[in-house]
Swiss-Prot record:
Binding-site residues, [4Fe-4S] cluster 1: 141, 146, 152, 387
Protein name, UniProt field: Lipoyl synthase, mitochondrial
Region (Disordered): 40-63
HAMAP family in UniProt: Lipoyl_synth (MF_00206)
Length: 430
């Protein structure tokens, strides 16, 4: 900038000295004023000199333009040619997708069309949700992000609608790699009003079937078994016609607590093995073992032989066909009555990845195999969960086969409800 200003001053000084001479002695003079620039880069000669039109600067092609040029032409869409089968590379490209910020993208498996569900919207769904909020109750339907929430809460009829209440709070003391429920070593204390509030809500809804489940509470001496049993008693008092299924934890292997819940007046005792034995250490919390789950189901049936026992397995975790056969044989050996199969769906990217999206026809195949092995009922499908349409399944299938048997009959010392009430209160049964 200073150099350019100096040149201007020199030129103007020369012009002043020449203008002082007589006009007859002055030669023709053309004054050129130099323009100074803030940067040191000189202007493009092709721009400053219009005569130099042969040299032009081309703009670099954009990535978007390249993709358009490399893509299909308009004729490809209107040619009317019959679609040809995709080659393996093209099929894989449609099955997967890259997600994440630039430079850190990860390949994920796309969700198949058969796993996509509509947004929940029904009057029964809204009413149940509002009542839950008013009574400070939790459901595993919401906490575990179940895709069937509108289907189950709506139901094909009011009496067949199913709700799954999650007792003892929304924070679990265990951390299974497939589950989206919150975890903590010190969850909040139990709500003493929860059994009464749960019974009150269910009596309002007029449901025909309810599933009670809970988080694991290893911080409690009894694992929450007495709280569970008290809730069942309250429900049966306020709504004696409602069918109750209890989906319990393993109570750290304490079979006395299993017997306490089994004698509480419930209709179905459920405990999930979740996966095959070989994958259990990688899927569930290390405190939950496959053999311990079998002992829980066996103890429930031994406590009350007429009780219906139930379990559930997730597919798509990497299990083999031979491992599934072994699992079903182990379940039938301890007289489990009902089994369900469903697709594992990753709740968040922090949870274990899906190994495989199992096709619907494979689920149908395992349903047929389970029924042939002697299970009373099997619900099997990509969107099936442990309590998926449990009311309809139980009412339409299992109860018909068990009709004529008094499920709630008294046995042993005193009636079932009397014994459980004493145990819940901490009294000895005589």
């Amino acid at each position: 900038m200073a150099a350019s200003t100096g040149k201007l001053r020199t030129l103007f000084s020369a012009h002043s000295s020449l203008s002082a001479r007589p006009s007859s002695a002055l030669p023709a003079l053309r004054l050129t004023i130099l323009r100074s620039y803030a940067t040191t880069t000189p202007p493009d000669s092709s721009i400053s000199d219009p005569s130099n039109s042969s040299t032009t600067v081309k703009r670099p092609p954009t990535a978007f333009k390249d993709k358009l040029n490399a893509g299909p032409a308009f004729s490809d869409f209107v040619s009317g040619k019959k679609d040809e089968p995709l080659d393996p590379a093209e099929a894989y490209a449609l099955k997967t997708a890259l997600v994440g910020p630039a430079g850190r993208k990860k390949e994920i498996t796309r969700l198949p069309s058969w796993l996509k569900t509509p947004i929940p919207d029904s009057s029964n769904y809204k009413r149940i949700k509002n009542d839950l909020r008013g009574l400070n109750l939790h459901t595993v339907c919401e906490e575990a992000r179940c895709p069937n929430i509108s289907d189950c809460w709506g139901g094909s009829s009011k009496s067949a609608a199913t709700a799954t209440i999650m007792l003892m709070g929304d924070t679990c003391t265990r951390g299974c790699r497939f589950c989206s429920v919150k975890t903590s070593n010190k969850p909040p204390p139990l709500d003493p009003h929860e059994p009464e509030n749960t019974a009150e809500a269910l009596s309002r809804w007029g449901l025909g079937y309810v599933v009670l489940t809970s988080v694991d509470r290893d911080d409690l001496a009894d694992g929450g078994a007495r709280h569970f049993a008290e809730t069942v008693l309250k429900i049966k008092q306020k709504a004696p016609n409602i069918l109750v299924e209890c989906l319990t934890g393993d109570y750290a292997g304490d079979l006395e607590m299993v017997a306490l819940v089994a004698n509480s007046g419930l209709d179905v005792y459920a405990h999930n093995v979740e996966t095959v034995e070989a994958l259990t250490p990688f899927v569930r919390d290390r405190r939950a073992t496959f053999q311990q789950s079998l002992r829980v189901l066996k103890a429930a049936k031994a406590t009350k032989p007429e009780l219906i026992t139930k379990t559930s397995l997730m597919l798509g975790l990497g299990e083999t066909e031979a491992q599934l056969w072994d699992t079903l044989r182990a379940l039938r050996a301890i007289d489990v009555d009902v089994v369900t199969f469903g697709q594992y769906m990753r709740p968040t990217k922090r949870h274990m990845a899906v190994h495989e999206y199992v096709r619907p026809d494979v689920f149908d195949m395992w349903k047929e195999r389970a029924l042939e092995m002697g299970f009373l009922y099997c619900a099997s499908g990509p969107l099936v969960r442990s309590s998926y349409k449990a009311g309809e399944a139980f009412i339409e299938n299992v109860l018909k086969k068990k009709r004529g048997k008094n499920v709630g009959s008294a046995s042993g010392k005193g009636t079932t409800s009397e014994n459980v009430e004493k145990l819940v209160a901490g009294e000895a049964v005589r």
